[in-house]
């Protein structure tokens, strides 16, 4: 399995040399709240979208059936 959402966020943060505090501020939440979400991995779709925007990224969510059909 691939990286978790939190691992992907950390990787992008590292590449962009930004801190958890910077990302929290840019995404409109407290550092503590973001840290808790990163630890627990409990992100809503809205959280992910806001964090991606703050990181200058986009998010694509795809559903693919077992037979390979993308919906």
Where are the predicted features?
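Short alpha-helical DNA-recognition segment
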Residues: 17-32
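Recognition helix of helix-turn-helix/homeodomain-like DNA-binding domains
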Residues: 28-43
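Short, basic-rich loop-to-helix N-cap that marks the start of a DNA-contacting helix
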Residues: 40-53
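Residues within the helices of the helix-turn-helix
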Residues: 10, 21, 49
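The alpha-helix within a helix-turn-helix
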Residues: 13, 24, 52
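Short amphipathic helical patch at the helix-1/turn junction of helix-turn-helix
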Residues: 13-15, 39
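Short C-terminal boundary/hinge segments that cap the last helix of small helical domains
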Residues: 56-71
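Flexible coil/turn residues that form the inter-helical turn or adjacent wing/linker of helix-turn-helix
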Residues: 5, 16, 44
């Amino acid at each position: 399995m691939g990286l978790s959402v939190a691992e992907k966020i950390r990787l992008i943060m590292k590449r962009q040399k930004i801190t958890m505090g910077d990302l929290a501020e840019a995404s409109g939440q407290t550092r503590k709240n973001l840290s808790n979400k990163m630890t627990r991995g409990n992100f809503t779709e809205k959280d992910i979208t806001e964090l991606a925007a703050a990181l200058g990224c986009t998010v694509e969510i795809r559903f693919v059936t077992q037979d390979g059909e993308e919906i």
